[in-house]
Amino acid sequence: MILGHEASGTVLEVGDGVEHLSPGDRVAMEPGIPNPRSRASREGRYNVDPDVRFWATPPVDGCLTEEVIHPAEYTYRLPDSLSYAEGALIEPFAVGMQAATKARLAPGDVAAVVGAGTIGIVTAMAALAGGASRVYVSDIAPEKLEKLAGLDGIVPVDASREDLAQRVAADTDGWGAQAVFEASGAGAAYGFVADVASPGGVVVCVGMPTGPVQFDVVAAQAKELRIETIFRYANVYRKAIDLAAGDTVDLARLVTETLPLERSVEVFDRGAEARPTDTKLQIRVDGSR
């Protein structure tokens, strides 16, 4: 099957009745196609529609090909200020947007993100855009944290040398972070996320562990924490594009290297190595820039 679910490109043709797009438009594509008549879609939760057809999810092919056919309602024109590379990164950024939306951040809140991979970084960006005054981002790989240098409002925490909960507590007079995002997918993280959160705060489960995890419910109850989960995203793609087009979000810094389509196997092999110095490896189809 064809892989790939993060894409941007150029419109070649449009069907009858499509008025917001024209051939030649540069676009980003939301990869999940729900059943518009499902209850989930009608309630605005189309991301959890059991019938959703999502790129590169068997048996549905992905977008790593020169041409795709995609519904116009899930195809968004890119502003001139965004490159094709940034357009393809709208998809992971939408995950961060969904997480920040579910957190219900208030202006000035302190946030913390566990995991400095792509999803962790875009979640931190979305939290800042959503009103957080600062975001602590922790990871056990210091190489990943180096990519955060120069990002205003982000405080890197090397988890191999420093305890996240203790650092946040020290900087907040013992109160904690109003929003904690678990974005690593590591089951062990659920052993301490409640310690990082402030009383009345929220823990948002973003990363997806490979199996069941242990979570101290009593610790969460003692602080009256709110627990939120996300699955992909819904109704945030246009907002994600608008934010990325401004000055507050820099998605281009996530791209480690771009290689041509004929070197795709090399890209996937390198991705499987999980080098801590790699954030996003992109594959370019001829004609994109």
Go through each PLM region and give its residues.
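Residue-level marker of beta-strand positions
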Residues: 6-8, 26, 40, 67, ...
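Mid-domain Rossmann-like dinucleotide-binding core that forms the NAD(H)/NADP(H) cofactor-binding site
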Residues: 82-161
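NAD(P)H dinucleotide-binding glycine-rich loop of Rossmann-like/cofactor-binding domains
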Residues: 33-114
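Glycine-rich beta-strand-centered segment in the early N-terminal region that forms part
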Residues: 1-39, 79-81
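C-terminal hydrophobic helical "lid"/dimerization subdomain
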Residues: 191-195, 234, 238-289
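Conserved beta-strand positions in the Rossmann-like core of class I SAM-dependent methyltransferases
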Residues: 12, 135-136, 204, 228
